[in-house]
Amino acid sequence: MMIPKGEVVELGKRGNFRDILKELSATGFTGYLEVSYKKGELSRAKVLFSNGKIVAAGIKRVISKSEIVGEKALEELLGLESCVVDVYALDEGKVAKALEWNRNAVVEHLPETEVEVEGGLTEEIITTPDEREAILKKYGIKMPSEEEIDQIIMNALDGSYDVIAATTSAPGDFESLKNSLISTAELYLGKMSKKVVDVINDCKSAEELVERFDEIRSAAKSLVIFIPRKKIDEMLSEMERLIGESI
């Protein structure tokens, strides 16, 4: 999941994930959690909140790089007896952006297993479709339709890319971000970085970089014959961090 940089509320909070979740929900928390834990392999998750309700969730395995999103991610997190959580606050505008960028991670319903848990959570901790729509509408953000998403994927496969409802960033900040991303690509990929750099240079805003990050990822992973996969994954993780901190 890609989420705008938030303000630190608390770092290194330890405990049962369910208890931490209940505590934050009761305070009407708006922001996100970064959750670190080991279940089979080291994993890191992000959970997005709006007014004490869960909006979206996603997990990324550190070694295998596999991802789980939405209800499946929340189901795994609810079973954690021990984890380390960093808490970050966001304003609703940034929550709306994160929601737009992570549509596939939206939590629509509580996991089915939750109803079997004594004293389990209720659907009241999940945002309803109307609540999510209200957040987006307030900030003038339009979620792409399924047809538009399909078109984006087709364009990406064709080598082109149409950006939907992209907004702009401050030119100076954006140029600095682009330069950092290009330097990162050149550091990890050397002379093979051209395909990745071309996509970065073609972007006109930080938001467009987010929209086209799958294209950057595809360009990088096409080099796996020449560059170790681990090195490519490390570069992409660093780029995600740079973009997240700038928006």
Swiss-Prot record:
<protein>
    <recommendedName>
        <fullName>Uncharacterized protein AF_1501</fullName>
    </recommendedName>
</protein>
<dbReference type="InterPro" id="IPR019249">
    <property type="entry name" value="DUF2226"/>
</dbReference>
<dbReference type="Pfam" id="PF09987">
    <property type="entry name" value="DUF2226"/>
</dbReference>
